[in-house]
Amino acid sequence: MNHDFVEMLSALSAAGARFLIVGAHALAAHGAPRATGDLDIWVQPTRQNAGRVLAALQAFGAPLFDLTEADLCAHDTVFQIGLPPSRIDILSGISGVDFDAAWPRRIDVHIADLHVGVIGREDFIANKRAAGRPKDLLDLQLLPPPRHLPGE
């Protein structure tokens, strides 16, 4: 994962923000890596978490302009940092899934020296179906079958 992505995830973690990786990087975590031009980070849209996200963005050095806590509490904010292939998208909402419902179903992955949450498989599927764009439907076709551990 590129250095800027790791630095952003580190800043969010250090600030105590609640967030989940979604999009193509989540697809990779579920076993189907594909090329992408960005890192999609879904943040919990609450006032308390919004303050943490803003602190993380400031620590990262993001150009905040007029981004506010209220923006991060709305369910339709997309805040973009940089340009592809290193763009970071901070999302306050995604299609078809509620953050608080998805949080306990997340999977934890190890990236650099961090443990971060990734949207769980069923929520990933629900999001891609709800978004319905051709690339989202293709992601569903790329998603491998669920892995079962012996004894499950």
Describe the residue ranges of each PLM region.
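Compositionally biased terminal segments of proteins
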Residues: 1-152
